[in-house]
Amino acid sequence: MSGLFSLESWSTVWTHRESFLLGLGNTLQTAVCALALAFIIGAALGLMSTSGSKLLRIIARIYVEFVQNTPLLLQLCFLYYALAFAGVSLGVFRTGIIALGVYTGAYMGEVVRAAIESVPKGQFEAAQAQGFNYLQRMGYIILPQSIPVMLPPMVNQVVNLFKNTSCLYIVGGADLISVTYSFVTGASTGGAYAPAYIVCGLIFFVVCFPLSTLAARWEASLKERKGRVNPGLKTAAKKVELKEAA
């Protein structure tokens, strides 16, 4: 081709646009499934990290530290290649879901933990004084206040997860990055490097930028309301006052 940014290169990318859309579809499918797994792991880790059991807190801490301090690529390669040598073949799609879910779940667990710990300790004590069990304390007092706090950083983790799907390229996935690489190295399409990677980058940007903006505005809105009296605190305090009066 006559140049990296030639009209012929852009025309080639446009002609094969369905390949990029297919890659985007595979990326979204992997991201959604991995996100569901990450939510489950994150919620479990967050609750374990704030539980009264020292053993559960230690297990959660070990998991988080190990996953966060080892590269995602290494975890992905281990699941795909090391297990294959052991006779366990998960396939690219399932490997991607598990690796991304396990990795992102560690970060979501920290988000859940921080959100729960942001609730004043006095509200735990007020709920205990009313005879609430653990599930009641979490359901009526703690989670209603911590969920709005954890949502903005959760959205940021969703963005990170979507971008991390690019790591599937290392195991030959059919994600957007893999499709782009196959395109630029193809016998009939090779040479359109710049247009192909620009289109790939724009697709990532179109998906990630609105989510990042939403998270930033959401967080700013929460900070503006930070000084207001928390309804959960007022409810718990009122119940304590009624019990003492009785």
Per-region residue spans from a language model:
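Transmembrane alpha-helices and adjacent helix-loop boundaries
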Residues: M1-A246
